[in-house]
Amino acid sequence: MKILVLHVHGTYNHGSFMMGINFIYYFSKIYPNSIFEVELDSREDYLRLKKEVGGNIKIVRKERIQYKKDNIIENILSKKKFLFDRPKQIIEENYDAVVILGGDNISEYYSGWKVVIRLRELSILSRKIKVFLVGQTIGPFYSWRKIFARHCLKNIYIYLRDPLCAEYITKELKMNNFNVCADLAFLDLPFMREEVLSKYKLEKEKYITIIPSGSINQYTSSRKKYVSRWIEIIKDLIKKIQFAHYKIALLAHVLKEKEGDENVINEVFNTLSPKEKERVCKITEALLPSETRAILGGGLFSISGRMHGAISTFQKGKPSISLSYSVKYKGVIGMSLKRQDLIIEAKGNDLWETGKIKQMIDEKIDYLLSNYEKIKKEIKEQVSILKDKVIWQIKDIANKIENS
């Protein structure tokens, strides 16, 4: 069985990387002889993927077509490759299936025109090959693109990761060709590298992990205010009496991108005094998801500007205060995981300019500590339910491919 897997290309985004790891690993347990062609940016990404799924799984690197913006000619040629050459080439490869992993790349949150190209490609591919959208948050779409999306997605097998998205595509796109499942990252990763805690001198449950997202514009237009609020939040945590013997782990969950978390973390860390730095562990190395999950799961709780950083914390049975900028947080964490109580709606200039965001985080921390054991128990129970949904999803995909 030969399967093309898309949207895992950058393994330094631990969210999409974890989804790719888990799909490949758990699918291969059903069909051990499967060959996975995975679109990846580099050989380094290929080696990182191989290390996380294990050596016996057959993975072939498929080079990713990159958008080139150096000049008008290269820009036009790269768009031609995406619009015409790539769909044709994929069809000619005779794959048994094409699997496009989530989360929210089929929406207008990040780019309007790119989603039109993606939708067109999906439509072309689905006429010739079985196409699966897995672990997805689809939409929102606006204007004529709603009708366009409905047309392009009509022949595709869709597996959503939350009920809110199901409500949206039922009401707004008038579609019903989907199953409601859960995010692939809720499954256990194949490996858990807890030795990373010793490397950073982190003692279990004696630290708090913070992921300040590098996607600043999703929260506020003021970089200066965004960074200064994170500095205040961290300084305040260090001063709190109840955390006097705790460290702060500043963890990058998305790296080596224009909006990589390491950029904000370095800026924040460099403003701290030498004494404050003794209490803060800066983690901006290119770790593997099995290492970042060990860090997130080993702490008391996390505060995360990356949704999959929060998911990894929850997956290990610990609470995470999630700073939301889109509906995916409400759907995946609020509705699927039933932890709306740990979400802060953090998008808006006013929150960061006035400092209200710090007050909101303080209130959530107080609430979390007051209900800590109860919340942990509920998280473990709900994660177990979501794991079963993800396993069902992978088995259903395998059955549909086999019966083609």
Regions from the PLM with identified roles:
Residues 1-404:
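Active-site anion-handling motifs in enzyme catalytic cores
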